[in-house]
Amino acid sequence: LTGVRPVKYIRSIYETRDNAEEYLRNSLLVSDKKIRLANDVIRIQKPVLDSLDLRKISLYISIPFCPSRCSYCSFISASGEGALKLIDDYFGLLLKELDIYADIVKRFSLKVDTVYIGGGTPTTLSASQLDRLIDKLGEFDIANIREFTAEAGRPDTITEDKLRTLKNGGVRRISINPQSMNDSVLEAVGRRHTVKDVCEALEIARKVGVD
């Protein structure tokens, strides 16, 4: 019994077999302790899963660019001046792709429940690009979504104009990621900002009034 979500498989066994625990114990060799643990997880998950509306979807928008690449990073992203030259072309294609998905959402009567703008570093985009992106998201009817979050992970990409653009567009939460509050560590891992930059970015966020 392996995988990142083994309980999902166990739940399917309970739904299709009368002798589920016997099958888990004798055929899959799951210990009694793990069966009890799985049962506890299933019991806790059930009210949440039962409440899910399959017509509600989450929209993830990837901005796979960073001003520089951190030495520990395992995410797919592009950095450096050569890569940053691709932003305009990527952004234009992203808007076209959002048009396609907006049409799919309408055609199948889906409802966007949450929006997450991630990366990379979305605040690598200019304030005007962020404004165009949020304007495009208006085609999805996001007025009453449950969550609208944008990563602002690199303090050296944060400006007041960008955060005001995000807030005015409906973004309720941002993430500012110091990674370390030690300048020597930041330099060692390739972050192009200082602890002072982090503090200034947090002050800008407070001033703008975004969480």
Regions found by a protein language model. Give the residues of each.
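N-terminal [4Fe-4S]-dependent radical SAM core
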Residues: 2, 15-59, 108-109
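Generic structural signal for short, solvent-exposed loop/turn connectors between secondary structure elements
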Residues: 13-23, 137-144
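Residues at the beta-strand->loop junction immediately N-terminal to the Walker
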Residues: 60-62, 118-119
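Local cysteine-cluster metal-coordination motifs and their immediate loop/turn environment
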Residues: 62-77
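Conserved non-cysteine loop/helix-boundary elements of the Radical SAM core domain that shape
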Residues: 77-211
